Amino acid sequence: FYGLQTRYRDRNEGVERVGRILASELPESIKQYHLVEQSNNVPMVDTVIDADTFREHATYSVPESSVEDTYRRVSPTQQQVDAYEPHRATGAFFSTKFFWTQTFGNPEDFYLYQIGLLSSVGYKFNEHLGIYGGIRTTLLDNFDKFNFTVDAEEAFLPRVRTRVREYVTGPMITLDTVFMQWSDRLADNWYYQGYGGYLETMFGGVGGEIMYRPIDSNFAFGVDINYVKQRDPDSTTAFMDYSAVTGFASAYYQPDFLPDTRIRASVGQFLAKDRG
């Protein structure tokens, strides 16, 4: 069975509920249930439930049994990956949500804000390739109080994020992003993606990322690299002369004693070509 469990935060509860349905509907001749979870149409993990052990747990035939004793999580086999047929691998999609930008302690006014709609639209060509876009529509703000967009001080580093005022005081409706993305599973526990286009409000370019993430491990490792150019704040599609190569090698750690916390350490080159 292929899908993505999002209803229950407790993984064991989700596995148990699905397992009870399968145990009641499928014949006892079936000895294993395979629940293959996917993310972005890429099979990520196979939860293998031992049917006989689960039925004993579900009927309380074994005292003090735990649902964790009835299943194991492994990387999907290549056969399972090849057999995966997404319910909707192609087609258009659209969504809209509110955004709210705010800053405190500005020279013009203590509190400045911008409220609007971020509309996302795209088209999936297959389970790996898609084109994605975003349009920002400002509904209410007080950014007209700005009496400057870029300060007059000399900067040691190239101005990248310090030009943000030029980008948020443009037309009411702006093109936020338009890019193509390919993502896939490279091998067991290895995943990658590549992308290109207008990647964010201030920069566009091409890039890619590869990640090693073992099933249920506390650690993961990734590397990303991008070549980007700064977008012209006075134009919807034009770029400025400034360009940079940016990227990082990152390590991720999720400690057992803080299960809802992820720690990340990265080293690499930033947009202003400084390193750290």
Regions found by a protein language model. Give the residues of each.
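Conserved mixed alpha/beta catalytic, RNA-binding, or beta-rich assembly cores of soluble enzyme
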Residues: 211-214, 223-225
